[in-house]
Amino acid sequence: MIIEPLSLTSARWRELEQVYGSAEDIGALLAALYANENDDERTELWYGVWATLCPDGRVFSAAYAAVPHVMEIAANRDFAERVAALHFVTQVEVSRHQSGAPGIDEDLLLAYASAVESLPARVAELHGITWDEQTAQVLGAAVLAGKRQHALARLLLQHGVGE
């Protein structure tokens, strides 16, 4: 069964929240990430995703709709971008269990859950590449988040590398 994420052009984005209020522009931000091939511009777009949807460990409802897209966007990208995307999804999953985080609306739940549950498989795709400590920290947390061990994933993300 194929689970479709929220369409990037759906009016539903207006009903979701990001750090600055309505998430009506998030579909366009994600569409730009799908389409843009310029590395510098992609870096700015990724910054926009983090800054609007999961800044400082806080999560907003539009992040739940964005997560399946983020996984799809990064699927065929280079190693660093794939790790960054897995980090974002892991942070969203960890943050949604914090006090005050918004719940996941029913219409977003299946696509979101499917994306989160795919984290361990996405990490396994990167097994043949050498990981530095920070990458191992992020990818270890991603496996834990995908296995619904959000408290352990949070601890791993919060633990300083080299401590």
Each model region followed by its residue ranges:
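Long, helix-rich interaction regions
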Residues: 1-12, 17, 93-163
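HEAT-repeat alpha-solenoid elements in large eukaryotic scaffold proteins
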Residues: 4-6, 38-50
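Conserved hydrophobic register position within alpha-solenoid helical repeats
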Residues: 44-49, 85, 135-140
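Helix-rich alpha-solenoid scaffolding regions
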Residues: 66-67, 76-90
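Hydrophobic residues within the alpha-helices of tandem HEAT/HEAT-like
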Residues: 49-53, 88-96
